[in-house]
Amino acid sequence: MKKMALMGLIFSVMASGVFGDENDGIFNYKIGQFDVYMIVESQRDGNAGILVGADDAALKKYIPANGFKHTANAFLVKTGKQNIVIDTGTGAGGIVVDKIKKLGVDPEKVDAVLITHLHGDHFGSLQKDGKAVFPKAKVYLSAKELEHFTKTSPNAGAVAALTPYSSQTVTFEPGELSAAAANKKLKEVLPGISPIAAYGHTPGHTMFLIENGKAKLLIIADLLHVALVQFPLPEISATYDMDQKAAASVRRQVLEYAAKEKIPVGGMHVVYPGVGNVTKDGNGFKFTPMK
């Protein structure tokens, strides 16, 4: 079994191709003919205090004595026909936008922005001084997420970020994880990209499955915040999770799916390279970063 798992991991890397530069905070991962870039906006010392229900023994076992890093990431997808941004970071210092430019894409050339959820470290680069940073882009997000953060429990930052895109905002109903696990065809929001519901962190928290040819990558967004602990102990949630019980449940389901189907995952709070393979490890999971 271990040999088969290893071969699956090797095949995933060989089939898709990887390379990157940690100094630049950019990691490129090939999904068939698609180029996916993980972009680091910021990295700082992590805080295990955000974990809910983690005892001292677990923290000591999984977190090094010298601590760990917390990162905030965004993604850029070049399909050959479209330039697609998945989440935009906080907007601090214009870092995400500058790195997108470095990758050869002017903000005016971004065709779509996919928002996983409406927390400030995911929509922050959408607007600057009340104007759209990506003026020609359509902004896609879950209808449930939009309803919650603009009407049910309005968030001023989210409203301000989306206002310049009032005529360019597109909502969707994400597919069910059970359908993906059953290998059913999911409804695409854009060619090669399908949204999948992962509610718990927020009411409309959404993942995106990127597919081209036989290659896949699952953008898990904020499924977890402290990878060192939450991969092996998926029942541990974070204070940021609005529904911690639901977040823990969907976390385990998603990791089971990724491990079983050998689908690499990419996360917004997974340290560089931010992309890797998930395998079963006892009652939890192991994350192996791409190299």
Where are these regions (language model features)?
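Metallo-beta-lactamase
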Residues: 21-23, 30, 105, 109, ...
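Positively charged n-region of N-terminal signal peptides that target proteins for export
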Residues: 1-4
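Active-site environment of divalent metal-dependent phosphoester hydrolases
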Residues: 24, 118-125, 148, 178-179, ...
